[in-house]
C-alpha cells in the first residue's frame, strides 16, 4: 500500500481514500500506520474484506461508510441510503429454498465468459425466486438423437443462447426437439429462438429442409429470413 501510494504521490497524485483488500479485519494500529505513511485521515482508510457472495460487497462497503467518506471529500450531503431491497436480495441468495439445473447448449462452452450475460441473468432469476441455479454446460456438437437422453436426463430446463455460424447448429436443434418432446422448459435467445422455429417447422409441420436463409440460402422453406439491412 505505502509503495503504491508513494508512486502516486511521485506523479503529484494524493489519494483521499484508501480501500484495503483483506482476508482479515484491519485493526486500528494498521489503519493508523497506513494513515501516517500515506498522509490521509485514519477514518479514510477502509477495509474491503472477502465476502462469500459478490453481491454482499456493497453492503460491506456501506458498513465501512465509503459513500459518506466520498461525499465528505466532495463536500456533498450524504443521506442514508435505503438498501433494504439489496439486503433482501442478498438474503435470498444466501438462503435458497430450491435448486434447478439448466443445460446451456452452445459451441463456446469451454469459455464460460462467452455467455457471461446469460449466466448472470440466470443467477439473478434464481435469486429473485429463492433458487440456486446450477448450469450444465453442453457442447452443441455432442448433442445427437443418440446422446440426448443421457445429456439431458438430469436437467430441469434447456437454454440455447445466441450464436452464429454453422457449427453446432444441428446439435442445438436436437436439444430444442428434446425439450419440446419431453416437455422440458426451454428458452431460446436470438439464434436459439430462430432454431426453435426451424425445429418446429421440420418436425411438426413437416418442412424437413426448413432453415434460416443465413445458414442455408438454398432451403426451400426459409422460415427465418435475413433482414434487409443485413444483406451485403
Question: Predicted regions span which residues?
Answer:
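N-terminal beta1-alpha1 cap of cysteine-dependent amidohydrolase-like domains
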Residues: 1-232
Amino acid at each position: 500500500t505505502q509503495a503504491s501510494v508513494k508512486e502516486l504521490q511521485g506523479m503529484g497524485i494524493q489519494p483521499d481514500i484508501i480501500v484495503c483488500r483483506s482476508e482479515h479485519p484491519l485493526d486500528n494500529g494498521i489503519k493508523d500506520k497506513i494513515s501516517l505513511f500515506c498522509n490521509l485521515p485514519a477514518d479514510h482508510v477502509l477495509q474491503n474484506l472477502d465476502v462469500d457472495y459478490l453481491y454482499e460487497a456493497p453492503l460491506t462497503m456501506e458498513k465501512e461508510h465509503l459513500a459518506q467518506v466520498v461525499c465528505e471529500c466532495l463536500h456533498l450531503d450524504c443521506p442514508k441510503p435505503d438498501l433494504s431491497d439489496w439486503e433482501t436480495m442478498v438474503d435470498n441468495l444466501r438462503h435458497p429454498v430450491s435448486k434447478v439445473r439448466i443445460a446451456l447448449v452452445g459451441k463456446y462452452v469451454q469459455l464460460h465468459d462467452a455467455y457471461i450475460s446469460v449466466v448472470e441473468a440466470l443467477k439473478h432469476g434464481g435469486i429473485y425466486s429463492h433458487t440456486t441455479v446450477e448450469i450444465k454446460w453442453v457442447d452443441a456438437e455432442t448433442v445427437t438423437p443418440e446422446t440426448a437422453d443421457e445429456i439431458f436426463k438430469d436437467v430441469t430446463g434447456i437454454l440455447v443462447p445466441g450464436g452464429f455460424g454453422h457449427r453446432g447448429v444441428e446439435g442445438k436443434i436436437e436439444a430444442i426437439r428434446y425439450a419440446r418432446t419431453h416437455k422440458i422448459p426451454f428458452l431460446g435467445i436470438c439464434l436459439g429462438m430462430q432454431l426453435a422455429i426451424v425445429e418446429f417447422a421440420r418436425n411438426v409441420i413437416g418442412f424437413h429442409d426448413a432453415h434460416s436463409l443465413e445458414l442455408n440460402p438454398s432451403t426451400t422453406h426459409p422460415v427465418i429470413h435475413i433482414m434487409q439491412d443485413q444483406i451485403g
